């Protein structure tokens, strides 16, 4: 028996775009985590495709929510050990901020947004969420922000496909949202067990309502404004 393909029909007023970790450390050459993902970006066109999704969502008037990852100096006081990727992020380090109440040192840092995305992210309408602290949205306000907007359908993408992107997918599903994933607007790294991008795609197909290319996602988003 084949795996069902539920599909997802986007609807104006009920649909949003959610992007995770849209930050220099993962998405810009020279970022502390760039080398982990660079090969997958080259294969997928990930950085360009994330830009295309942003542009399409803005043109269609779709709400855009960015789920950033920030670490503050006080986070170094954590005692409980993190898992493998959490430990790696601390070693690199990535997404460092001087504190939650200051922007000192943020501009151009690894925690900042890539310059090419700022016209869309910093337009006064994009929702920049409180930071997720490990992988998923249980530590930020994504679910609240979606519910307050009566959003029920979400298109999700971001650089760390089998880590933060998948964690957000799982959180959204557990709370009743319909979710479409964008297969070539993700990245990933590999370890001795296999390739992270392929692991993400396998699980996206098992879990999500739909798995689209960027071309498909952009076309479906554009249809909302017609």
Label the model's feature ranges.
Residues 1-16, 25-26, 43, 52-60, ...:
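Active-site-adjacent betaalpha module
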Residues 67-70, 159:
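Short, well-ordered beta-to-alpha junction loops that form the rim of enzyme active sites
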Residues 13, 31-57, 61-68:
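A short alpha/beta connector and helix-capping loop motif
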Residues 20-21:
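N-terminal nucleotide-binding beta1-loop-alpha1 segment
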Residues 72-76:
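Short catalytic/ligand-binding loop motif for oxyanion handling, primarily in non-cytosolic enzymes
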């Amino acid at each position: 028996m084949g795996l069902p393909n539920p599909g997802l029909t986007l609807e104006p007023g009920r649909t949003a775009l959610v992007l995770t970790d849209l930050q220099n450390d993962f998405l810009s050459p020279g970022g502390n985590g760039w080398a982990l993902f660079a090969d997958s970006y080259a294969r997928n066109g990930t950085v360009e495709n994330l830009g295309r999704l942003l542009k399409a969502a803005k043109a269609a008037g779709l709400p855009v929510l960015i789920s950033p990852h920030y670490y503050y100096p006080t986070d170094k006081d954590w005692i409980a050990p993190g898992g493998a990727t959490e430990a790696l992020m601390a070693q690199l380090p990535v997404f460092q901020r001087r504190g939650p109440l200051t922007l000192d040192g943020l501009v151009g840092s690894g925690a900042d947004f890539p310059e090419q995305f700022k016209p869309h992210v910093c337009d006064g309408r994009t929702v920049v969420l409180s930071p997720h602290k490990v992988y998923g949205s249980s530590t930020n306000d994504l679910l609240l922000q979606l519910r307050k907007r009566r959003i029920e359908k979400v298109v999700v993408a971001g650089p760390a496909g089998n880590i933060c992107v998948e964690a957000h997918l799982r959180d959204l599903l557990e709370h009743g949202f319909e979710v479409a994933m964008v297969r070539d607007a993700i990245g990933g790294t590999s370890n001795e067990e296999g390739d992270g991008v392929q692991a993400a795609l396998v699980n996206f197909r098992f879990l999500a309502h739909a798995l689209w290319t960027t071309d498909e996602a952009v076309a479906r988003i554009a249809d909302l404004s017609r």
